[in-house]
Amino acid sequence: MKKISYFTKEKIECPVCSFKFQKEEFLTGSSRLIAGELKIDLKREYIKNDKYGNIYPRIYSITVCPKCYFAAFPSEFNSIPKNKKEILQNKKYERKKINTIFDNMLNFSKPRTLKEGAASYILAMLSYEHLEKNYNPTLNQAKSAIRAAWTFEDLEKEEPNKNYNYLQKIFYHKAAYLYKLVIEKDKDNSEPVSASTMFGPDTDKNYGYDSVLYLSGLLEYFYGNKDNKEYRYKQLNDIKTTLSKIAGMGKFSKEKPSILLDKIKEVYFKISKEMKNLK
């Protein structure tokens, strides 16, 4: 199979443990990626390439130190403040426990597999937990959680019957909680989100803050409390209100991607149907 990634010649230094390593980069071009459908949760699927096989570009998004497992998005990996170095060093063994999920098969010094991809997002969540608000830690944790869920979904397809679907559900629940928290922290200014932030949620397109609102509502719809009918009805009504606001109160907006509006419309009608059944 042809190469889909390479290791940089120049080594980078981990800001936490000072270990120097070569970073793996995804190779673009040569028609490697064949875009498939955009799923309702904004996950971009890719069609298997006859020449390169299955390609999962999102598994390369997080920079991970192979020695101490500190992990972050590339733009922030080398900008960790000195006052956070000690706590991140002390949490090394906590991060290393991730190996038990993957039968001690992780190796960030070799070309990544889906296992390293999923692990990288979990490690990023653990690392961002200790960073200050200017790093948008909650948003970065939310993005990492949903991408971890997607990667476990891909793992389940590649290696079924290993409980990866269970882990997928866990990280969808984490993403639901975190996206809701992003909105709350942005509103009370405890962690304001800049408009220039890369929201994703996937690697193919930046859907802006609208994606935060949309995913918060969507994940609440899928994974929220469904036991209490009265609570569920109010919950669904609140989600519908949020979706209407994103779409501009039902009016078409040229500023918003049509595909996002299509997804909003799809979810809106699903919710309306469920609300009718709850009456």
From Swiss-Prot:
Q: Which InterPro entries match?
A: DUF2225
Q: What is this protein called?
A: Uncharacterized protein BB_0011
Please give the organism: Borreliella burgdorferi (strain ATCC 35210 / DSM 4680 / CIP 102532 / B31) (Borrelia burgdorferi)
Lineage of origin = Bacteria, Pseudomonadati, Spirochaetota, Spirochaetia, Spirochaetales
